[in-house]
Amino acid sequence: MPVASDVGGMERDTEAESDALPINELFYSLQGEGKLAGVPSVFIRTSGCNLRCWFCDSYHTSWEPQGSWLTVDDIIDEVQSHEDAEHVVLTGGEPLIHEESAGLLNRLSELGYHTTVETNGTIYRDAAIDLASISPKLESSTPTSERDPAGDGEWEERHEESRIDVDALSRLVDSYDSQLKFIVTGRDDLTEIETLLDRIRSIAETEIQRDDVLLMPEGTTREQLDERRQEVAELAMEHGYRYTPRLHVDLWNDAPGT
């Protein structure tokens, strides 16, 4: 169910109900990344994000946020229309910027769904989350003036200041079954990854195992992934981390609703 009416910077529609969420798209597909890659899942993609990665694969949830305000009941009805689905993935954008995401997750859990939340790890919420799929954004994600899709570098400083919150990351790791999924652009990212993991481990009570850490090649098309997948796979083997594909890109390239 694609929805694409402009929501103008993600300000709430004055007519939207109190439990409404801005939804960019809602669809049934295969989980493409992480520990649950290949699992049939319903994806709920919220619109709006507190960061601006230059390589964002959901441009119309961040740089130009679009969507329609749907109530939790409306979202649940759409999820239940996919009768074979047992897994639901709440993604974005950054879904946890919306307080109503917690209510939606709790409802989904009450109905027996396994819930995964795809988050950049800058916000903690107390909710029914079965798997916190945390993707901390590295320095290589920062939209410098040379890489900014908008061409002006306006978000560079704000993104850089906000992209890592070690306290939020440690709370997520301590509260939920989690995976730490890093988007890797090259070998230079590994030093930052190792340093960040040390910082989280120094605060979190939960031990982070090496197989909780996943390296994923940056790329939103098959051609872009082809340029990096071998290097990232070799880095995963070299450091003892997991390699995760982007299965949906391999299967459907950059088609929406996949």
Where are these regions (language model features)?
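Residue-level detector of flexible, active-site-proximal loop/helix-junction positions
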Residues: 30, 60, 250
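Short secondary-structure boundary/capping segments within folded domains
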Residues: 32-36, 45, 234
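Haloarchaeal acidic low-complexity proteome signature biased toward cell-envelope/secretome components but also
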Residues: 1-31, 243, 253-258
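Short hydrophobic segments within beta-strands
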Residues: 26-29, 91, 183, 216
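Conserved Radical SAM active-site core
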Residues: 8-9, 16-17, 21-24, 40-41, ...
